[in-house]
Swiss-Prot record:
This is Putative phosphoenolpyruvate synthase regulatory protein. Keywords: Kinase, Nucleotide-binding, Serine/threonine-protein kinase, Transferase. The keyword Zinc-finger does not apply. It holds the Pfam family Kinase-PPPase. It catalyses: [pyruvate, water dikinase] + ADP = [pyruvate, water dikinase]-phosphate + AMP + H(+); [pyruvate, water dikinase]-phosphate + phosphate + H(+) = [pyruvate, water dikinase] + diphosphate. Bifunctional serine/threonine kinase and phosphorylase involved in the regulation of the phosphoenolpyruvate synthase (PEPS) by catalyzing its phosphorylation/dephosphorylation. ADP binds at G150, V151, S152, R153, C154, G155, K156, T157. The keyword Plastid does not apply. Its EC number is 2.7.11.33, 2.7.4.28. GO terms for molecular function: ADP binding; ATP binding; phosphotransferase activity, phosphate group as acceptor; protein serine/threonine kinase activity. Belongs to the pyruvate, phosphate/water dikinase regulatory protein family. PSRP subfamily. NCBIfam families: PRK05339.1.
Length: 270
């Protein structure tokens, strides 16, 4: 039976999930997880405590409990359960208070809540990335923080959205299609913003697999076409001196991190 895991918070539980996933990913086993956000009252906390205790009774093993609870009364209820507690906030806040010489002022929903200017900036970035996805329009390229380039299905859209959602970066993206291959060049709107261009590439065999699942046995998905497009686009990157990374076998988080590392774009944390 897979070990049971609870991610609990009086907010969104995103912090608890991220912390827990980072720790548990070090172990080569599967976990059965349950996320419980917005545990904002003692009544809710007692119900969660019962769930944890029932899990212990059913499995005979203490479940792992990762939590980021601001309210100390609610936190104490979770402490009193039969779970193995991993308290993200208290583990680090107390030593930091001593080091900084000031007392923390916990505020509910501060980490991932709606925070006026910063929240609006993130929403603006997300809207921008959606409106400027896949070359839908070239009107707003001058306002982009970064413009991702690449062949179809190489990871442009998820990378753009991740950059906007996670870091508040206005990321547009532009595709090069099979019709472009005979005379591959940058459109004028991209030439004007050459300093913002960043290329994505991918192994042709992997691209072939992805496209086959979308349009099987078509010219678009053929290995020959995939090899041609990747070769032509990579040659253009080198010719135009556009930095690029290979997305093959990399998660969207890894791709975004590589992009930020190469470009030096500022991360807007929320």
């Amino acid at each position: 039976m897979a070990p049971r895991v609870f991610y609990i918070s009086d907010g969104t539980a995103i912090t608890a999930e991220v912390f827990g996933h980072a720790v548990l990913s070090q172990f080569p086993i599967e976990f059965e997880a349950l996320t419980i956000p917005f545990v904002e009252t003692l009544v809710k906390a007692e119900k969660v405590k019962l769930q944890i205790n029932d899990c212990f009774i059913t499995t005979g093993e203490r479940p792992l409990v990762f939590h980021s609870i601001v309210n100390p009364d609610i936190r104490n209820v979770i402490y009193s359960s039969e779970g193995m507690d991993y308290d993200f906030l208290n583990t680090f806040v107390a030593p930091l208070e001593q080091h900084l010489g000031i007392q923390a002022c916990p505020v509910l929903h501060r980490t991932h809540g709606k925070g006026n200017h910063s929240y609006e900036a993130r929403i603006d970035a997300i809207n921008f990335s959606m409106e400027n996805d896949d070359g839908q329009t070239m009107k707003h390229m001058d306002k982009a923080d970064i413009i991702l380039l690449g062949v179809s299905r190489c990871g442009k859209t998820p990378s753009s959205l991740y950059l906007s959602m996670q870091f508040g970066i206005k990321a547009a993206n532009y595709p090069f299609t099979e019709d472009d291959m005979d005379n591959l060049k940058l459109p004028d709107a991209l030439k004007r913003n050459k300093n913002k261009l960043f290329g994505l590439t991918i192994d042709p065999n992997r691209l072939h697999e992805i496209r086959q699942s979308r349009m099987e046995n078509s010219r678009y998905s053929s290995l020959r076409q995939c090899r041609l497009e990747v070769k032509e686009v990579e040659m253009m990157y080198k010719r135009e001196r556009i930095p690029f990374v290979d997305t093959t076998n990399h998660s969207v988080e890894e791709i975004a991190t590589k992009i930020l590392d190469v470009t030096g774009l500022a991360r807007h944390m929320f």
